[in-house]
């Protein structure tokens, strides 16, 4: 990908980067383990973003 990105694309990539993480431990505790993992986790090589 180009080094010089439009601002909109850069913001979308930043949002995807922040949302691509495990859920906090306190969420697992608070929901009594009903929510254990993030279903929307994305691996950089397996699935690509539609940006």
From Swiss-Prot:
Stretches assigned to coiled coil: none
Family: Belongs to the eukaryotic ribosomal protein eL39 family.
Tagged with keyword NAD: no
Membrane-spanning parts: none
GO CC annotations on file: ribonucleoprotein complex; ribosome
Biological processes per GO annotation: translation
GO molecular function, one term: structural constituent of ribosome
Keywords: Ribonucleoprotein, Ribosomal protein
Organism for this UniProt entry: Aeropyrum pernix (strain ATCC 700893 / DSM 11879 / JCM 9820 / NBRC 100138 / K1)
A Pfam family recorded for this sequence: Ribosomal_L39
Protein's recorded name: Large ribosomal subunit protein eL39
KW Ribosomal protein (keyword) present: yes
Highest taxon listed in the record's lineage: Archaea
């Amino acid at each position: 990908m180009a080094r010089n990105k439009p601002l909109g694309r850069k913001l979308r990539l930043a949002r995807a980067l922040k949302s691509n993480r495990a859920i906090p431990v306190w969420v697992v505790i608070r929901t009594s383990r009903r929510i254990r993992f993030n279903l929307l986790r994305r691996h950089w090589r397996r699935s690509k973003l539609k940006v």
